[in-house]
Amino acid sequence: LIVSPKGSVLSEAAAPIQQGILAASREATASGACELVQYELSNPQDAGAVLKKAADDGAVLAIGPVSRDAVQTISEMPYLPLPVVAINRPSGETAPELFLSIDISAESEVEQLAKIAVENTAQKADLAANNFVILTTQDPYDERLARAMEAALVKAGAGAERRHISSDQIAYLRQEMRGKAFRGAFFAMNAQNASLLRPYLPPELPVFGTSYSNPMHQKDSMLAKTQSNDLNGMITLEIPAEENTSTLVAQYKGERENLSLEELQMFSVGVDAWTLGTKWIDWARRIEVPDGLTGRLSFDKDSGSKVKRELVKTVVSPNKTAHPDLPLKRI
């Protein structure tokens, strides 16, 4: 298990992923047939040396790292001493023979949502309205999300334009939108900001948002319900572990009782990384995990080194806000 140094920001953020890997390994190897050993990676450039050390120690599989720089370094190596399941995506399309990566980035979610939006509004493409409007703020993460949405929509064959909205502009949004024909609207902002904007958009306009904009992520159930009323009908994506918590609760009850919803997402990534690893350890050129906790997982080595992850399409409703057995908080 390739981990970041203890006490580092990335180590704390990735802790639920490690919890998921450990929980899945215990579930699968109750007989003690497998041992998990952690190797710290401080400098991305040392990734090769760390993998060699693990292989020399008798390791047969490496799960991690999470750091994008470290994953990039490994993906550019000509040879790997053992199979690797990286938990991030490299920028390039080429990678060593024994390299596999599971993509947990916001960009991968945006790409899937853009395809859904284009398909759901196909009838509008025949009209004057072919462009989507992307509503965002000056927040750096929102900006990153908006740029990803624009690129994904263009790639999917639609037009897109970004608009920055500040609190003092909200009152003028309805007037500004009057007379404009859009195929749909994307929210590149959190649920609170999205819920404030939605009433100012035409009610018939289809709206879309990633899980970041989903009000079910609110800790306060009343606030979640209020925001869900405003965002009623918004199409978004979630991981199966959020849509169907019963399996996760039953299988990993003791492991995830104190996890927030965001931590649950990362925990689920760890479980799926372990599942992929148990198949990748045999150098399987094709892998299918239809019941993955983070989505339907599929991999074809002939098509590249990245695992395709299909999330669950869901529609926001005030009748479906938060899971009562999960403590919700943003981290």
Kindly give the residue locations of the regions a language model identified.
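Hydrophobic alpha-helical segments within soluble ligand-binding/sensing domains
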Residues: S101-V133, R144, P240-L248, V269-L276
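Beta-alpha junction/loop-to-helix N-cap segments that form part of ligand/metal-binding clefts
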Residues: E12-P16, S31-G92
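Extracellular/periplasmic periplasmic-binding protein-like sensory domains
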Residues: R198-V271, I281-R285
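Short beta-strand segments enriched in small/hydrophobic residues
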Residues: L1-I17, F132-L135
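Structural motif
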Residues: C34-A55, V110-Q112, R144, S166-G179
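Short, solvent-exposed amphipathic alpha-helices that sit
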Residues: E12-T29, E109-Q112, P140-G159
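Segments of small-molecule ligand-sensing domains
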Residues: E255-D325
